[in-house]
Amino acid sequence: MSSIETYMQSVGEQTRTASRAMMRATGAAKNQALLAMAEAILAQRAELQAANAKDVAAARANGLEAALLDRLTLSDRSIALMAEGLRQIAALPDPVGSITATSVRPNGMRVAQMRVPLGVIGIIYESRPNVTIDAAALCLKSGNATILRGGSEALHSNVALGRIVQAGLQAAGLPTAAVQVIDTTDRAAVGKLVTMTEHVDVIVPRGGKGLISRLAQEARVPLIKHLDGNCHVYVDAAADLAKAHDIAFNAKTYRYGVCGAMETLLVHADVAQRLLPVLGQALHEHGVELRGCARALQWLPEGKPADDADWATEYLGPILAVRVVDTIDEAMDHIARWGSGHTDAIVTENLSAAQRFQREVDSSSVYVNLPTCFADGFEYGLGAEIGISTNRLHARGPVGLEGLTTLKWVLNGEGQVRG
């Protein structure tokens, strides 16, 4: 066994043991730990930023692009937001132990389901140190233990944040091994983590499509994941066009780099001539490159011809594919063929069209008269999220505290026997 395998095996064993203690942890103890972490993050701002400066300097020397450098940097504001996020998670209801789906059988036996932690969650992520705190906090609050493997470019930052997390656990009388930060940059650690079925119950990857595709191929542990967010807005024949304009513009331009950004606009032929010239001009003036089908280009003078690659692409940038369709069926067929199952929306004042779209479009979130950029756990009232899942099993859509738990059946009786 290699040194990395030995190290990861030890981490897995410690975390599995800690997970059993976390299942018994009270809500008060978990909240105490979270609040202690929030105080420590603010109190140790200078130490955190000193560790982060090492990561930023190395990343800059290695030519990391500006957008990723920005994500990597722990500014005063980002540190304050991490502390506030911890307080917000502490204030959320504890899902563990809640009882649902109760019934009484004819023999008097009481049947219910209880929400319980998943166990040990492995989180694999890239350059954002704040994920260390977000992931640790959500796993802690939901009664799980977690193994965190951040990007090599953020190693010093993640290790420093991990020490704060473990100090918070210790202050609340919880096992420090309940949150462990992998302190090696060896990629073999990731390969071992995703195959440790005896110690890890689920993996949550947060990163680019390349990372997630690789993990999906290598993992033996189940993944909560989405590969990409190729999101659509369909403007129906019965749409309010002022509403459609604002929704489509917001869905594309709110933030280009989020997985809920609209990447393809589908417009019914009956309204294309009235909507596309105005909307296209607004998007063009905002710096969005438009790529359209032949029919759409009639009303998009600045547009370029689209091909199949455009329908399949999550741009994560100021590019939008536009297609004119003749029916809602054609729109839904397009989404079924090219979509990623993330988030799709219809703009319409026709109730039956809205209901049909929500029923038949097979995505984790389906909206009526809303922009796709609402795909976020905070906007859903979840308080926070570990990520967004397009899986059909277990969690689907934004994954908050409840998505980090599972259900077990609990039955109570008075001595009944089965005849």
Swiss-Prot record:
One of its GO terms (biological process) is L-proline biosynthetic process. The gene is proA. It is an enzyme of class 1 (oxidoreductase). It comes from the Bacteria. Its EC number is 1.2.1.41. The keyword Amino-acid biosynthesis applies. Pfam families: Aldedh. It is found in: Cytoplasm. GO terms for molecular function: glutamate-5-semialdehyde dehydrogenase activity; NADP binding. Pathway: Amino-acid biosynthesis; L-proline biosynthesis; L-glutamate 5-semialdehyde from L-glutamate: step 2/2. This is Gamma-glutamyl phosphate reductase. It comes from Bordetella parapertussis (strain 12822 / ATCC BAA-587 / NCTC 13253). Keywords: Amino-acid biosynthesis, Cytoplasm, NADP, Oxidoreductase, Proline biosynthesis. It catalyses: L-glutamate 5-semialdehyde + phosphate + NADP(+) = L-glutamyl 5-phosphate + NADPH + H(+).
